[in-house]
Amino acid sequence: MKTSVSFKITIFLAALFLLAGQNSYGQIHRIGGGLTFSSGAEFNYGETGNPGIVLKTWLALNKASTFHIVPSVTAYNRYKLETGMYVLTNLMFQGDLDFQYTIFTEGTVKAIAFGGGNATYLNSNFEAIVLTGNEIVTDESDFAFGANLGAGLELRMAPKWDFNISGKYLFSRYSQFVISVQGVYFFKSRRTAYRR
């Protein structure tokens, strides 16, 4: 029986979340959202858009809450090119699964490093305004896997809020540098869910 790539990814992520839940510390205790800015990638005679909206969460893997699994999804603004002959619209979506480690803590600032996997989906919609019969651009879509490597800072702003800033490089067929800023909300008090 043949299985699609998306089905394999779904099974892998489901198994990872189930395994994380077996550990008594593997609980989601914070969620973040914000903006992502990418150096972009060329696709189908166009580029990808900025900024992106990112949503992510953290699963603590140890009692000290220094090691986390961090899944995230990002949807980027569309890139639109109008030439008078045609309109090209490119969309980019990314899913990441990173392992994050706290390098050190100084007061209310935490330095973190992370690495993991990335899946990028690109979709390009071509709309001809004037048909010549010799169009070299058409509708196109692509799916690529890659790896992330990055670092960042977590800044404590309030008892249940953090501000995070991070940068990473994505190694893939569509390699790019990505900077992200997020507001992070903690579901529980930090005394029980998160140590500083």
Descriptions of predicted regions:
Residues 43-50, 80-87, 124-132, 175-182:
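Outer-membrane beta-barrel translocator domains and adjoining extracellular loop/strand segments
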Residues 31-37, 69-73, 97, 111-117, ...:
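Membrane-embedded beta-strand positions of outer-membrane beta-barrel proteins
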Residues 56-129, 157, 187:
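Gram-negative (and chloroplast) outer-membrane scaffold detector with strong preference
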Residues 2-11:
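Bacterial N-terminal signal peptides that target proteins for export
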Residues 69-70, 76-79, 147, 152-196:
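Predominantly the C-terminal beta-signal and adjacent terminal strand-loop region
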Residues 10-20:
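Bacterial N-terminal signal peptides
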Residues 27-31, 47-53, 87-95, 109, ...:
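Residues that define the transmembrane beta-barrel architecture of outer-membrane proteins
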Residues 22-68, 178-190, 196:
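Short glycine/proline- and aromatic-enriched beta-strand/turn motifs that initiate or cap beta-hairpins
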